[in-house]
């Protein structure tokens, strides 16, 4: 066994369309702390970090206060509740880089280095923070731990599908009447999220497309709206569940323009370490911009596909 071990909570919620972790941090910071305590106890970890997005400075004050309250009650510190178990948790604010949402880039940043991904293997569980074994999970995952411990794994697994167990927090944004965060059972039809929970399309327009898992996953056309919201169903449809951010696009939108806006974000946020991403995003932007300006050619489609395959 290798010690010390570390727990890192990934609260660097930077994927466009995603805001579920922010709401958990804002409204129930002690749920996250409880989940981190349970995880640390199970894995014999004595030091935990909450790596928060740089723009979450207001939430860092809330989190620091909650940690102080937990220490005052004896839930953090030395010999917690007389068990001989020691644990302290610290917050750390990033500098706003999108790439630090990737676990190994987050670890580099937490160590004071450049926010760039590491080669894998070794994986963080073997060689993570300070080259020691590290458990790294996001806010939502750690917040589910207390429920599973209290109610039992069978109860949690009774929700969802055969391969996608439990529930999922989904951030619904875009052209809906009631954007927000909704907790659903895995396997719920995407149409249920859009038309029931989120109130339907704004101005009673028609659905044109939707991005089911944050801006980095492929968008789907409107005729796929009944796809169950779970890992295997979305994968079969040609996309991913991703970060759990459902972005709804109505028929007032030019999809080419939307694509250009998304590419511009990734072009700006590329950390520059890997050539396919660094150069590919710029070429994608230039080509799609030409199409947007009515200067496109049929051969551009093949070129775009070739660049995407290489990326």
How would you label these PLM feature ranges?
Residues 27-59, 130, 137, 143, ...:
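Internal alpha/beta scaffold segment
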Residues 1, 15, 96-108, 112, ...:
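Conserved phosphate/anionic-ligand binding catalytic regions in large, soluble enzymes, centered on
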Residues 11, 21-23, 47-48, 52, ...:
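Ferredoxin-type iron-sulfur electron-transfer modules in oxidoreductases and energy-metabolism complexes
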Residues 33-39, 186-204:
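Short amphipathic, charge-patterned alpha-helical segments
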Residues 1, 158, 163, 171, ...:
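Accessory "access/gating" subregions that flank catalytic or transport cores
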Residues 1-39, 207-211, 249-252:
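Function-dense linear segments that define catalytic or interfacial modules
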Residues 3, 60-186, 198:
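Hydrophobic alpha-helical positions that pack around
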Residues 53-55, 83-96, 162, 166, ...:
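A glycine-rich phosphate-binding loop feature that marks nucleotide/adenosyl-phosphate handling sites
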